[in-house]
């Protein structure tokens, strides 16, 4: 089953105009039902090729590309091609920052967190480094020991794949 995107950036978006993804997926499932499709014997594939070229402009700063506002858009976005991570300082300066994926879950991704807890007053200097060429990303930088735990929003280079994954999970439920 191919999900061919048409450039809508609001699928699963937090934006107030967005249709909740469960409601949208129910609508998609009704299309399958009307077509007589009861079971998918294969894969659900998200096709985000609606636009030509890379999803971000080549003049954008590499540090900005990993942030949510640098996610860029493609033909099939999911959650604005962003991803939330829960972050908190480690127990001491120099210790690893505590990082967990919040939403959307991307089980095919491999994440590494070489980021460290920094001295008080140094703020949030976390940056995600990722690429659309392989399912790997690193959160680098530092997070001050005096900062409260927070949700950090970074880019997801696999919006189309994420949309297909969530629709597939919806169909299984």
Predicted segments, located by residue:
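Conserved serine DD-peptidase/penicillin-binding transpeptidase domain
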Residues: 1-173
């Amino acid at each position: 089953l191919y999900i061919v995107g048409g450039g809508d950036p609001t699928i699963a978006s937090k934006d107030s105009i967005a249709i909740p993804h469960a409601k949208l997926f129910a609508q998609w499932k009704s299309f399958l039902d009307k077509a007589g499709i009861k079971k998918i014997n294969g894969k659900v594939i998200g096709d985000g090729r609606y636009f030509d070229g890379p999803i971000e402009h080549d003049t954008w700063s590499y540090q900005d590309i990993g942030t949510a506002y640098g996610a860029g858009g493609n033909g099939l976005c999911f959650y604005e091609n962003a991803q939330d991570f829960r972050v908190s300082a480690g127990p001491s300066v120099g210790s690893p920052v505590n990082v967990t994926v919040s939403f959307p879950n991307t089980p095919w991704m491999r994440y590494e967190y070489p980021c460290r807890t920094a001295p008080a007053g140094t703020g949030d200097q976390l940056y995600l480094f990722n690429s659309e060429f392989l399912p790997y990303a690193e959160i680098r930088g530092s997070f001050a020991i005096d900062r409260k735990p927070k949700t950090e929003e970074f880019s997801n280079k696999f919006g189309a794949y994420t949309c297909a994954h969530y629709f597939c999970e919806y169909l299984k439920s």
